[in-house]
Amino acid sequence: MTEQLNTNQQNDEAQFMIQRIYIKDLSYETPNTPAVFQQQWEPELKLDLNTTTTQLDKNVYEVVLTVTATVMNQKTTAFLVEVKQAGIFTIQGAAASQLDHLLHSFCPSILFPYAREAITSQVIRGSFPQLVLAPINFDALYMQQLEEKQKATGAKDETVSH
């Protein structure tokens, strides 16, 4: 009886599976070579992140994490690398709020190490010093985004009520 109860509890939980992880797009530009190689190396990194999701089928989603790294050296662009790291995920039995969290926080957390490796590899192939991107707390970014949405919704509600 206990085993049957545990099985039923497990079936009520959300199920998550990675089907595939792949690079959807990769771009690398070095607009100021070879002059940038002659400069003292004092890099300044600008990092941009974006996540998009698409439902492919019932319970099947594509999540694309776009990471753009622009490195400036002495006010000129040394290089720009952009990777669209994608994954196809099966998610079953998740409540709407849980699904949103999985798609916009958990899945990007899975994809980021792959994107980081692709960026590092391209930078090294371009003969620049290794670019090591720090880990990103996608849970914190997700919570910040939720708070911003709630504030925006609250501000709209206040405007309407006055």
Curated annotation (Swiss-Prot):
InterPro entries: SecB, SecB-like_sf. One of its GO terms (cellular component) is cytoplasm. Its main location: cytoplasm. It comes from the Bacteria. One of its GO terms (biological process) is protein folding. GO terms for molecular function: unfolded protein binding. Keywords: Chaperone, Cytoplasm, Protein transport, Translocation, Transport. It is found in: Cytoplasm. The keyword Chaperone applies. Gene3D superfamilies: SecB-like (3.10.420.10). Transmembrane segments: none annotated. Homotetramer, a dimer of dimers. One homotetramer interacts with 1 SecA dimer. HAMAP family: SecB. PANTHER family: PROTEIN-EXPORT PROTEIN SECB, PTHR36918. Belongs to the SecB family. One of the proteins required for the normal export of preproteins out of the cell cytoplasm. It is a molecular chaperone that binds to a subset of precursor proteins, maintaining them in a translocation-competent state. It also specifically binds to its receptor SecA. This is Protein-export protein SecB. It comes from Legionella pneumophila subsp. pneumophila (strain Philadelphia 1 / ATCC 33152 / DSM 7513). The gene is secB.
